[in-house]
Amino acid sequence: EFTISFSSPVISTGQHIDVGDEDYHDGDDDVDYTDDVDDVDDSHGSPSQLLQGGYQRNQHYGGGNYQSGYYRPNKQHGNGYGGQYPKKYGSGHKY
């Protein structure tokens, strides 16, 4: 019957959202939710996808909500807004 482990809290999204070692660095490495969104949508995903990925991914940043993932402008393919936010915003998970 059910073989899904409850240790995989994001399995229901159908997106590839790891919570492995690459995910809790500084949030600025190239393996983060933006790549997972790109797996689903060759553009940059809808804001809802980004919010979903950011929220779930940042559960283990220590209490950050979806903003932790959503405002991460210093990515080369970014959050779907073409990097219009200045780099000074830095890594979103510091919110």
Curated annotation (Swiss-Prot):
Membrane-spanning intervals of the chain: none
Family classification: Belongs to the immunogenic miracidial antigen family.
Protein known as: Immunogenic miracidial antigen 8C
Region described as Disordered: spans on this chain: 1-95
Regions of compositional bias (Polar residues) in chain numbering: 1-15, 45-59
Protein species of origin: Schistosoma japonicum
Sequence ranges of Acidic residues compositional bias: 20-41
Organism phylogeny: Eukaryota, Metazoa, Spiralia, Lophotrochozoa, Platyhelminthes
